[in-house]
């Protein structure tokens, strides 16, 4: 790699088999080849990201086996005929026909928590359908396949829906919070299944976590996942630009992050589930109301904590379309030692928060803009040696903006999250009724094909680096540190193995370039030379790159792009990199300066990048 650069990110974020894909911009043979960075996180679907469309993307899983092979289901007084015309223009639908009263088809499984059972159905001899899950109170819902409305429901269902998908087909959904052992589909009559004959068409059944039916996932003998998968790198588009998001392990302590009614309700607030479109694009935001005032109406989560602990609460609140003068809010109540109660109100029109009582140490983080929603986050640190925390989300916390007063108020919310730590991390969905943990994001070390000795240029563009130790490291062959990049005391810094070499006035975010040329080293940050006086070169060479964090570190890394050149770019190019990012003319001039590349190498880069299109995250 003596005459090549290595790039990770930029406009070419890609993944292959769960690993990040960087690419070498011309090796000594003139070829452009992928370089894989091994990525790990964990074995569940607790992580999320903001996708390129601006919506929160989750991991999804169809828990029903043989989701459209109904001959592999068990029938009770029914027959199933394949090869029928489907809702999607295929011949993948089935005719489900009953031969006795209450005939049905079912699939055995083991499921718990908030789940949505859905299927595509169409009337035939029967003009109604029935979905039922067996467990608890046996939740069920009837659906009128002629008029497209939900009929009778029962058994503790949370919500139900029927969606017209055209051609007489509907997608029907049953939403519940029950431990179940099977899922059933019935041909039915008007709010009954007692008819001794009848038939409907069925296709593409799905059982998944959450309050909405998402895009169908085909399964066979095993469950299948989609969306943001286990151990998949998270390319996060918060702010519109793709960044590699690396976060520490965090646990969401809220029992239900979207099913607000599943949490403890104090004072009887009115909760309406599936009320509005949420930041993930589904109809799974809730509405909370106080229609009477007089007493506080709130959602509560209470649990034991360590003395003098720090917790961060975050919630998405739909933006108001006009100014507000009555406020919802959040309350932290630490008890068991010297009790400390803090109240924070939020303004969903302006995207601001105000502490109207602060007995614990509070940090009100800047509201994050999620299109139609604000994400409000508050950190509270106990200083009274308390061992119990009660966290409250209020329908109305203040009618005057200065003191806690109950009143009439409603607002729309989504994504309740309470995590131990001093800052909010990305949303962790929880439908379990307990806590759920997102595991640590880690990229293992990447070894270059050959080490870089002598002159080099390192370009890094990050949205954020929060670290107590180096978050991006460049090491020699023997593993000793050559250069480590991180943020320290609100400014960028680089450690050369023996000293810090960046001036303390350097910004903590943005673009940074390290240029090593002979015995000289320079640091450019956001267009300005920020080299500390007396900075020295580390001549160990670069053989490995590590973009990682340990479970002991409270790091967030949001890496937009990283480029490694095995030559020293000019000062003007370095300055331009930290203002404009990697531009084609810089890459072109670099390639032109490398006289060992074969003719046509630049064209091969274009071809290689085109071939990456199917891998782009």
PLM feature segments, named:
Residues 83-103, 244, 275-297:
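Short carbohydrate-recognition loop motifs
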């Amino acid at each position: 790699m003596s005459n090549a650069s290595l790039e990770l990110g930029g406009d070419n974020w890609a993944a292959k088999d769960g690993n990040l894909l960087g690419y070498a911009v011309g090796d000594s043979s003139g070829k452009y080849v992928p370089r894989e960075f091994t990525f790990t996180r964990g074995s569940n679907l607790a992580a999320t990201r903001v996708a390129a469309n601006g919506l929160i993307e989750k991991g999804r899983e169809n828990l029903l086996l043989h989701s459209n092979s109904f001959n592999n289901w068990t029938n009770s007084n029914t027959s199933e005929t394949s090869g029928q015309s489907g809702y999607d223009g295929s011949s993948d639908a089935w005719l489900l026909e009953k031969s006795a009263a209450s005939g049905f088809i079912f699939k055995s499984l083991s499921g718990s928590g908030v789940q949505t059972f859905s299927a595509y159905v169409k009337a035939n001899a029967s003009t109604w359908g029935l979905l039922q899950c067996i467990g608890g109170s046996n939740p069920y819902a009837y659906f009128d396949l002629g008029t497209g409305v939900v009929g009778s429901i029962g058994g503790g269902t949370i919500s139900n829906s029927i969606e017209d998908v055209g051609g007489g087909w509907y997608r029907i959904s049953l939403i519940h919070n029950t431990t179940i052992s099977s899922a059933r589909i019935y041909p039915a009559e008007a709010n009954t299944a007692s008819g001794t004959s009848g038939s409907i068409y069925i296709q593409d059944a799905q059982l998944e976590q959450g309050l909405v039916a998402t895009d169908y996932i085909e399964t066979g003998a095993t469950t299948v996942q989609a969306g943001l998968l286990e151990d998949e790198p998270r390319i996060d588009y918060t702010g519109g630009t793709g960044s590699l998001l690396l976060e520490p392990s965090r646990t969401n302590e809220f029992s239900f992050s979207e099913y607000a009614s599943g949490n403890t309700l104090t004072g009887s607030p009115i909760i309406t589930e599936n009320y509005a479109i949420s930041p993930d694009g589904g109809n799974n935001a809730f509405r909370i109301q106080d229609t009477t005032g007089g007493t506080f109406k709130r959602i509560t989560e209470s649990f034991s904590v360590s003395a003098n602990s720090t917790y961060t609460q975050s919630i998405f609140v739909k933006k108001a379309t006009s100014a507000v003068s009555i406020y919802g809010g959040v309350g932290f109540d630490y008890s068991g030692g010297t009790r400390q109660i803090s109240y924070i109100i939020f303004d969903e029109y302006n995207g601001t928060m105000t502490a109207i009582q602060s007995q614990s140490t509070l940090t009100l983080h800047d509201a994050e803009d999620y299109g139609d929603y604000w994400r409000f986050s508050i950190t509270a640190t106990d200083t009274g040696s308390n061992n119990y925390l009660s966290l409250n989300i209020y329908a109305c916390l203040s009618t005057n903006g200065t003191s806690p007063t109950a009143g009439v108020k409603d607002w729309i919310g989504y994504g309740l999250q309470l995590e131990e730590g001093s800052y909010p991390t990305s949303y962790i969905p929880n439908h379990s009724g307990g806590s759920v943990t997102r595991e640590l994001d880690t990229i293992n070390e990447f070894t270059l094909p050959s080490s870089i000795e002598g002159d080099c240029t390192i370009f890094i563009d990050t949205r954020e680096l929060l670290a107590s130790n180096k978050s991006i490291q460049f090491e020699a062959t023997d593993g000793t540190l050559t250069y480590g990049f991180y943020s320290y005391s609100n400014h960028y810094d680089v450690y050369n193995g023996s000293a810090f070499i960046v001036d303390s006035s350097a910004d903590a975010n943005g673009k940074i370039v390290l240029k090593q040329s002979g015995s000289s080293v320079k640091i450019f940050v956001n267009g300005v030379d920020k080299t500390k006086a007396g900075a020295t070169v580390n001549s160990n060479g670069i053989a490995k790159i590590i973009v990682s964090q340990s479970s002991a570190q409270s790091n967030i890394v949001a890496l937009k792009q990283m480029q490694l050149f095995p030559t020293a770019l000019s000062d003007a190019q370095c300055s331009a990199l930290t203002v404009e990012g990697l531009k084609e003319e810089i890459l072109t001039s670099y390639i032109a300066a490398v006289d060992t590349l074969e003719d046509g190498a630049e064209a091969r880069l274009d071809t290689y990048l085109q071939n990456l299109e199917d891998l782009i995250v």
